[in-house]
Amino acid sequence: MSIISQIEACDFERLYEIEQQAHLVPWSFGTLKNNQGERYLNLKLIENNQIIGFAICQTVLDEATLFNIAILPTYQGCGFGKLLLGKLIFQLKEKGVQTLWLEVRESNSARFLYEKIGFNEVDIRKNYYPKPSGGRENAVVMACYL
């Protein structure tokens, strides 16, 4: 059974492990810890008593930005990202948020999940993300009107 709840201080070591495995260019431990506070709605996803994913989202007035979402690679493609995003959107609506923004690598297959949930492509940021092998990759800016 899946449980989704607020991220706690004791979760960061596990979140960092997931971050390192889930992203092409992962956040540092410091960046992960610094994206916390009263303006954030940060959730963890627990399956079989183990954290397998998380979402980092900042809220400002009636808008929110999804800064990071990560699901452990062995659990990707099983609906856990959709489950976590659904809970995040539900809680954002309860807070009066009207628009959820995100940006994603052009090559990231999560774009298709975002589109299914209701996100629309708003803009392209040319050469925004660095590639581990060198060079740059475009970012796709997306918005979901709640």
Curated annotation (Swiss-Prot):
GN (gene name): rimI
Keyword Cell membrane: no
Organism this protein belongs to: Haemophilus influenzae (strain ATCC 51907 / DSM 11121 / KW20 / Rd)
Keywords from the UniProt entry: Acyltransferase, Cytoplasm, Transferase
Gene3D superfamilies attached to this UniProt entry: 3.40.630.30
Entry function: Acetylates the N-terminal alanine of ribosomal protein bS18.
An annotated Gene Ontology molecular function: protein-N-terminal-alanine acetyltransferase activity
Catalyses which reaction(s): N-terminal L-alanyl-[ribosomal protein bS18] + acetyl-CoA = N-terminal N(alpha)-acetyl-L-alanyl-[ribosomal protein bS18] + CoA + H(+)
Descriptive protein name: [Ribosomal protein bS18]-alanine N-acetyltransferase
Disulfide links within the chain: none
Record InterPro entries: AcTrfase_RimI/Ard1, Acyl_CoA_acyltransferase, GNAT_dom, RimI, YpeA/RimI_acetyltransf
Record: active site: 103, 114
